[in-house]
């Protein structure tokens, strides 16, 4: 394990930034697939 004292763990950054990105991408592709992507 790397020493993460005084720093934010990379896995925490990845989780916090990854979940919203995956959600937005999922909504975008779902909207495009259902024909609503162009109206957004």
Curated annotation (Swiss-Prot):
Keywords tagged on the record: Chloroplast, Membrane, Photosynthesis, Photosystem II, Plastid, Reaction center, Thylakoid, Transmembrane, Transmembrane helix
Gene3D superfamilies reported in the protein's UniProt record: 6.10.250.2070
Ranges that cross the membrane: 8-28
GO BP annotations, alphabetical order: photosynthesis
Places the protein is found: Plastid, Chloroplast thylakoid membrane
Protein topology in the membrane: Single-pass membrane protein
Keyword Cell membrane: no
GO cellular component: chloroplast thylakoid membrane; photosystem II reaction center
Pfam families in UniProt: PsbJ (PF01788)
Keyword Chloroplast recorded: yes
Role description: One of the components of the core complex of photosystem II (PSII). PSII is a light-driven water:plastoquinone oxidoreductase that uses light energy to abstract electrons from H(2)O, generating O(2) and a proton gradient subsequently used for ATP formation. It consists of a core antenna complex that captures photons, and an electron transfer chain that converts photonic excitation into a charge separation.
Family affiliation: Belongs to the PsbJ family.
Cross-referenced HAMAP family: PSII_PsbJ
Assembly and oligomerization: PSII is composed of 1 copy each of membrane proteins PsbA, PsbB, PsbC, PsbD, PsbE, PsbF, PsbH, PsbI, PsbJ, PsbK, PsbL, PsbM, PsbT, PsbX, PsbY, PsbZ, Psb30/Ycf12, at least 3 peripheral proteins of the oxygen-evolving complex and a large number of cofactors. It forms dimeric complexes.
Protein name in the entry: Photosystem II reaction center protein J
Species classification: Eukaryota, Viridiplantae, Streptophyta, Embryophyta, Tracheophyta
């Amino acid at each position: 394990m790397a020493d993460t004292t005084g720093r934010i763990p990379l896995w925490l950054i990845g989780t916090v930034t990854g979940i919203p990105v995956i959600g937005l991408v999922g909504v975008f592709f779902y909207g495009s697939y259902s024909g609503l992507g162009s109206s957004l």
